[in-house]
Curated annotation (Swiss-Prot):
SUPFAM superfamilies, per database record: Metallo-hydrolase/oxidoreductase
EC number(s) on file: 3.1.26.11
Cofactor binding annotation: Binds 2 Zn(2+) ions.
KW Coiled coil (keyword) present: no
Organism classification: Bacteria, Bacillati, Cyanobacteriota, Cyanophyceae, Synechococcales
NCBIfam families: PRK00055.1-3 (NF000801), RNase_Z (TIGR02651)
Function noted in UniProt: Zinc phosphodiesterase, which displays some tRNA 3'-processing endonuclease activity. Probably involved in tRNA maturation, by removing a 3'-trailer from precursor tRNA.
Name used for this protein in its record: Ribonuclease Z
Molecular function in Gene Ontology: 3'-tRNA processing endoribonuclease activity; zinc ion binding
Keyword Membrane listed: no
Amino acid sequence: MQVTFLGTSSGVPTRGRNVSSVALRLPQRSELWLFDCGEGTQHQFLRCDLRLSQLRRVFITHMHGDHVFGLPGLLASLGLGSTSNGVDLYGPDPLDAYLQGVLRTSSTRIGYPLAIHRVREAAEQNTVVFEDDDLIVTAAPLNHRVPAYAYRAEQKPRAGRFDIDKARELQIPPGPVYAALKRGESVTLDDGRTIDGRTLCGPEQPGVSVVYCTDTVFCEAAVQLAQGADLLIHESTFSHAEADMAFKRQHSTSTMAAQTAAEAGVKQLALTHLSPRYAPGNAVTADDLVAEASAIFPNTILARDFLNVDVNPSK
């Protein structure tokens, strides 16, 4: 997996940061997933090497404008500029009414299949939001002024390295059967032998996981969702000194994000959703927030627009 940050500011865009959006690249399936879609997200696509035509799923955390105002325009542009096979949207209950209202009142036609899925029940009952043979997405409710949800996208474990020399020793004919054996499946050959693919593969390879958590004040549900994740993307709207403001507005400080990362045992923390008050030249800057978080969770990085982060299996 590779994560590309398209917007890392909270509330409003700044000269250096757009509002919230994160792209998850899935090169093995030529797909792109989007987490939140603040105003101007489609413009961010034009400034990097992401291909809008690969967009397959969009996960919305909550219905505040800095997380959803870019969605109608992006979906409309996708219909005009590509041959999309369809997009699935996941989010809070009002997402459907919001999107259908905008499309209807603007007489916008989406010329491809568009499905909208409510995540509230799955998040509250700790069930699956999306699953296929390779990936699984779960969600958890957050503590914010409106219903909000964090998401976890995780690759399923994969069969280990296929031992082709051993397969040849067993006189297994090459061809399509090798693909099934590489997946660890059992195959019956033409000569009647049944071969268990797991005996021809090395140790199972763990998948990688990314958790996207915004907007929220510190909450245990986020800690549980992020357990052992390879990358936790967590909002850091305020500095530690602004903790009272964070509780009042139901946002996180840098130290709350770090506490979540530490308690969840994640591998890496990326701070995003930064208040414009921490712009360069101000008394407190984004670098200060990273320093605060790093004192609790050392492997902390600062997200910035167009930053790419490769997410690889832990060794």
